[in-house]
Design a protein with these regions (language model features):
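Hydrophobic core of alpha-helical transmembrane segments in multi-pass integral membrane proteins
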Residues: 1, 21-37
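Membrane-helix interface linkers and caps
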Residues: 1-21
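Transmembrane helix-loop-helix hairpins at the membrane interface
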Residues: 31, 35, 45-155
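Catalytic phosphate/metal-binding cores of nucleic-acid and nucleotide-processing enzymes, i.e., regions
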Residues: 41
């Protein structure tokens, strides 16, 4: 993609519709209710910094890799532009589950990533950019208390 095309993809896109806004809020709401709130007493300044940093870096990287490249290269192709990267993104979420399995189970976590990814894929395709789904993805990934504790060796 290169820096300019990546920056353009991350910042461009038509505004989301009301339905899209609702759908893009759901993953973050789920992460807040299932991960952030139940573990809020474990959060200190260092953990919050790791959570926020991980959320921004991971979400941006995943959006560029699994949506941006395919959106740029196959903008009108349903299979290569949307379905193939959705499968890749979903299976991509299986790898960390081998090291730190979700309490929900590996495959439920991967299925959840696929459902969230399908909403983001639709939004990216409709808007022509990653801005809308990136905000949702950052908010969702920044709720990862358990993952941040693991990164700090606090498991």
């Amino acid at each position: 993609l290169g820096p300019r095309r990546a920056a353009r993809l991350l910042t461009q896109g038509r505004p989301p519709s009301g339905v899209e806004i609702l759908l893009l809020i759901l993953p973050a709401a789920g992460a807040v209710s299932s991960e952030l709130l139940p573990n809020r007493n474990k959060i200190d300044v260092m953990l919050a910094a790791v959570m926020a940093t991980t959320g921004v870096i991971n979400a941006t990287g995943e959006e560029l890799l699994w949506r941006g490249v395919f959106l740029q290269e196959f903008p009108h192709d349903l299979l290569w532009g949307r379905l193939w990267p959705l499968v890749g993104l979903s299976l991509w979420h299986l790898v960390p589950q081998m090291i730190l399995p979700s309490r929900l189970g590996r495959w439920r976590f991967v299925l959840g990533a696929g459902l969230v990814g399908s909403v983001s894929a639709f939004s990216a395709w409709r808007s022509g950019g990653l801005r809308n789904c990136l905000v949702s993805h950052i908010a969702t990934d920044s709720c990862g208390v358990t993952a941040a504790r693991f990164r700090l060796g606090r498991t």
